[in-house]
Each structure stands twice: as C-alpha cells, then as structure tokens.
Amino acid sequence: MNALSALSTEVRQYLLVTGNYWAFTLTDGALRMLVVLHFHTLGYTPLQIAALFLFYEIFGVITNLVGGYLGARLGLNRTMNIGLGLQVIALLMLAVPAAWLTLPWVMGAQALSGIAKDLNKMSAKSSIKLLVPGSQQGTLYRWVAILTGSKNALKGVGFFLGGALLALLGFKGAVVAMAAVLALIWLGSLVMLKKDLGKAKAKPKFRDILSKSRAINILSAARLFLFGARDVWFVVALPVYLSTVFGWDFWLVGGFLATWIIGYGIVQSLAPAITGKQRGHVPDGRAAFVWAGLLAMLPAAIAVGLAGGWSAKVVLLGGLILFGVLFAVNSSLHSYLIVSYAKEDGVSLDVGFYYMSNALGRLLGTLLSGWLYQAYGIGTCLWVSMLFLLLAAVIACALPRHSASHVNCT
C-alpha cells in the first residue's frame, strides 16, 4: 500500500483503469467460451451459436458511436462504471433457470455485454490520453501498447477460464461467480476512479459524434479494413477449416485459438520495441502504411501455398503465427495513433468514432467470412483479406507523417 501511495495520481489512475479493463476482459473472454461450450452441449448448431453473438457485434458499432458522446458529456469514470455494471447484469441474465435461456433471451444478454464491452474499452483507451502529458509521446505509445496487448492476452486466458469454470461450477455457477467478483470490482471503481475524468469543458452536441478531424477520419477508414481483413478469414473460415479439414475437435480448435490470442496480445505489448521506440521513434502515417503493406503479403502467401498443394498444416499454421505477429504490431500502432490524434478536450468523441469503425470492420469481416467460406472456400477469404489490407495501406498513406518521413504512395 505504501508503494502504491507513493505513485503519482496519474499512475494510480492508470493502474485502476487498467485493472478495471483487465477484470472486464477476463469475464468477456470467459463468457464467450461459456456460451459456446454450453449451448454446443445443448445441441445448438454452429449457425445458431453464431447468431447468439450477432447483437454483441451490432451493438458494438452503435455503442462506440454514441459512447464517445456520453463519455465527453458525463465523464469517462461514469461510462467505464456503467460498462462494468452492465456486464454484471448481463452475467446475471444468464443465471436464470434453463427454461428461460431461449435464443432471444441469450441474444439480449449478449447485446448488453457488447454494449458493456465497448463502453469499457472506449473509456480505458480515452483515459490514457488524459493521464500522459502531450509532450511524452513515447510514454503514451508504451502505455497504449501495454493496455491493448494485455487486454488481448487476458481475453485468451479468459477462454481457458470459461472452460475451467464450466467444468468446475457448471454454467449457472460460473456466471454467478463471475458476476460476484466483477460486482466487487465495480463497487471499488465507483469509489476510487477520478470524478469527471474525460468530461469535455464545452458540452458537445450530438452531431459531434462524427469526427471533424481529417487524420481521424482517414485512420478510422484504415482501421475498418484492417480488422475486416483479419475477421474475413479468422472468425468463421479458420475455425471451420481447422475442424473439417484438419479433423480437430472443438477443444483443440478453441485451445489453439486462445493460445494464438494470448501470443498476439504479448506481441502487441512489445510493439513499441519492434517499431523502434527504443531508438526514439514513435509511429506516424508512414509506419502505418509500411506495416499494413507487409501484412498484406501474408494472406496472399498462405492462399498460394494452399492452392499449390503444399502441406496445409505447415502453410496455414505457420502463416497464422506470422500473421498474428504482424497484425499485433499494426493494431498496437493504430491504437497509439488514435489516442495521439484525439483532441484532449472530449477525447472520447474521437476515440469512440474510431472504434465504431473498428467494430464495423469486425462486423463486415464476420459476415463475409461465413458467406465467402461457404460459397468459395478459405482461399477466397484469404484473397479478400489481402485486398482489405492493401486498402488499409493505401488509405494510411494520407495520414500525417513526421517531417523527416517520406513515402511515395503513387
């Protein structure tokens, strides 16, 4: 406690925001695995299970757009605490008798969880902007990378946690236990999180939810295609391919993807070292262009390897590991740029608009993944992924660059 009290107010607030985000992320990952496993054992088809998460994604788009406005008007402490509270309610909605767990009821609980997740994420990412002085861009990059990377690593841990809780406590016991722990964290956050954090000095109007910043609009468009490129082959096509072509059972597929997400999160945390922060460099538009261009080569290489008759396991699994490393760097770099570009007064408006594009890209990728894989196979999903990444790279060419940077995008 003495060591904690010796820290600056900004660092203590950062640790509190990060702790809230970590706790939420663990329950988010665990809940996803709980729902998938439990309803799989009840005989739900893969399509029905996918439908359970449809509202989760759709409401993510809406929440990011409106949540930034709410954060600027109410303060980020309130939007973060609202997110934690909504997740507790979503968990308790699933603790009802089994007869109540109809498809619409579970979809409603998932919608609430989706709203909670994006309120929490938007609040956490926006808060960092206010806790780091504008002159310390290297520190800002490092803090954003740690927050983003640790979140994804813990989401993977959450997948394993969900499976373990289901085995130990059953479905109802698992959601009640998670709700109880998260409720305690929520109560602590209500008391300790700084009041009026992120509240705009000038009350924003509702029309301000649409960004007026050229840099943020460009970055948001690039982010849409970046995450669409991942999910167009990762969400549906990859798990189904691993199951049907490789013959992996559900536990092996789930365990592999959870491990991939943990590794992906670790690389995100290390992104500042990978992109040259230790040499005094922080990313700009040129870096976003270069890293997206490098990433675009991978899905194309995987598609060529699969079509050429090479070992599918070597090509796909090896390519997936490399894709995870490069995608983690791209994602962490983008996360830093949005926080850097966002204006300090009403920061959540800019961050919320940006993550709305992120959620829209995920939704687009998810829908295309199912349709393209069913109609044309995984090869087409990979080529579309490459196309999306090339679009993300070209769009990133228009982002601001440091004065010493130059890249010819023509």
Could you say what each language-model-derived stretch is?
Residues 7-58, 217-260:
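Helix-loop boundary and gating motifs at the non-cytosolic
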Residues 22, 90, 102-120, 313-329:
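Hydrophobic core of transmembrane alpha-helices in multi-pass small-molecule transporters
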Residues 51-69, 258-271:
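Central cavity-lining transmembrane alpha-helices of secondary-active solute carriers
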Residues 61-98:
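Conserved MFS/SLC helix-loop-helix module at the cytosolic interface between two early adjacent transmembrane helices
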Residues 63-76, 166, 267-285, 373:
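Helix-to-loop junctions at the C-terminal end of transmembrane segments
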Residues 85-100, 293-309:
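C-terminal ends and interior cores of transmembrane alpha-helices
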Residues 109-151:
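Cytoplasmic helix-loop-helix junction between adjacent transmembrane helices
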Residues 180-199, 395-399:
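C-terminal membrane-cytosol helix-exit motif in multi-pass small-molecule transporters
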